[in-house]
Amino acid sequence: MKRQYKNTKKEFLGACFLGIVALFSLTIWHVINRTSKNKSYKVFVEFDSAYGIQEGTSVRLRGLPIGKVVGISQSSHSILTRIEIQSCNTIIPKTSLIETNQTGLLNDTIIDIVPFTTLNQEYHSLKEGPLSKTCDSNQIICHLNYLQGERGLNYDDLIRATTRISQRFDDPELFYGLYYLIGNMLKLSSNLVDCTEYMASISHFLGYK
């Protein structure tokens, strides 16, 4: 009886030990897998001007946030930004438009990435990811790639254009030119009305005859 009890106890302890080892292994695998999925990568994007970009500026892909600006350096002719993409699973085609835009009531600056092409799932670089040593920068944007950004929608340009238009309307020469044109159009329309009435009276007279 005692021997049977000891055997049962050993089997129970062995099962508990195996369960603990399995649970520990599963936890380690989950942590490693999660860490690898969330591993970020960085790219450099050059702009002609800052356009309101600062550290923390949001980076979006097709309208969804995927990263942020983590560094800015200035040269004599351009601004170089260092962008961190939050997950290495975010694959960006190399043929993409990178531009600054302003949004919201406060005109917050964001960086939009708009892909021009759709990636083939069979691409080797797509399977390996941007952090791979064999990443093909001709297909996708790889870790530490150097890219050129452009200027997109900017409310300062809109305000400047509106100001120029208002200044044009304040120009006396333009005002008198429009006044003269409107006067001639009114005279022409009056003459057309008189001509139409005259033709109508002639037609009525001929019909009466």
From Swiss-Prot:
Its main location: plastid. Keywords: Chloroplast, Plastid. GO terms for molecular function: lipid transporter activity; phospholipid binding. It holds the Pfam family MlaD. The keyword Transmembrane does not apply. Signal peptide: none annotated. The keyword Methyltransferase does not apply. It comes from the Eukaryota. GO terms for cellular component: chloroplast inner membrane. Disulfide bonds: none annotated. InterPro entries: Mce/MlaD (IPR003399), TGD2-like (IPR039342). It is found in: Plastid, Chloroplast. This is Uncharacterized protein ycf22. The gene is ycf22.
